[in-house]
Amino acid sequence: IRDRRYTVLTENEDYYNSLSDSEKSSLEMYLKAAENFWQITVDHHTYVTGGNSQSEHFHAADKIGYDATKSEYDASTTCETCNTYNMLKLSKALYQVSGDKKYMDYFETTYTNAILSSQNPETGTTMYFQPMAPGYNKVFNRPFDEFWCCTGTGMENFSKLGDNIYTVSEDSVAVQMFYSSEPV
């Protein structure tokens, strides 16, 4: 993981694209890079909701509680929603390549806790950050004069509600997310 000059969103996209490159060229190093990034992020920079980051960056490993409550950064700027979205893209791609269920377990937990909770049910607007510190309220974008990166991915999140409930292979269908649904 690079130094703090790069946002987590940039990091995530690099590893997702590396994984796409590995599918084209069969270079194991790209797959290994994506797997390592995913594992480091989940093990050392992720909150219980599945979201991660502080002020769009990774800081010291295993210090997310400090980042959320006592750091010099604004405690309301944890868990950037579009970074969470990109971790879901990476998780799905890693699952498709490896078949390892841990990626879909993370996907289900994160989609349920971080993505579904990121939309205002009354207005449809979305959140940029999801504060993990106690005492913070949710802040949603204003519908007509405020547009963040997470506004765009926020719309995309809710256009994919049924995308990963099931995965299909040649000889089976697997339930990946236990939501009320019917396979089509």
Give each language-model segment a name.
Residues I1-V184:
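Glycan-recognition and catalytic cores of secretory/periplasmic carbohydrate-active enzymes
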